[in-house]
Amino acid sequence: MQSSYPETYAYLLAHYDRLVPKCVSRDGTRDVPNATADTWYQYGRTQALTAFINTPKLIVGVLSKEPMYAMDTNDILIASGGTAGYCAVSKKDGSPYALEYIQAWLSNPITERILEIVGSDFEGGFTARGTFVLSTLPFVELDFAVEEQKAIHDRVVAASREIYEINDALSGRPAKRIANLLQRQKETLISEIQGLIDRVYRLDY
């Protein structure tokens, strides 16, 4: 660490008293069973740290007030466990559903209402939406052999990708007039996606 990432090491060293584990120092406060005197800065959690390497995924904020399902294609490392941190959703092998569609399904207000009912409630209006809760969610399957149903899926995916492009454009801080136009386009697309998922919930193909 010190030779490969000297500035990171210097930052960690500046906070040594807060980071040193109990097993390394009597003054330590962290429980990191595998840490040594040489790896005192070691991260405490190991759950799912390598489960989604080189895998596009949705990063889910486990404990949140609003839906948070961020598309990640940059191999961001996440820590998970219980109702802390984040969990991830990836595409199953052989699944016909794009991650963009799953993201739209999870973000839909109907899905969110179900999560509020079945998820654990925490003080301050927070709802836990971890892997166990997500695995129990109802999911209306589409018949991809039926043109109208496949068209709904494909349009949700296309509209989602348009939103990603708009977000990229907005991150470049365009002129206010352009930003307002892009924001309106984004809101229109979000409304369209929500309407399409609402139709699937109603079996209105």
Tell where the protein language model's regions lie, with residue ranges.
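Polybasic, glycine- and aromatic-enriched phosphate-binding surface used to engage nucleic acids
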Residues: 1-151
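Non-catalytic DNA-recognition/assembly elements of restriction-modification systems
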Residues: 139-205
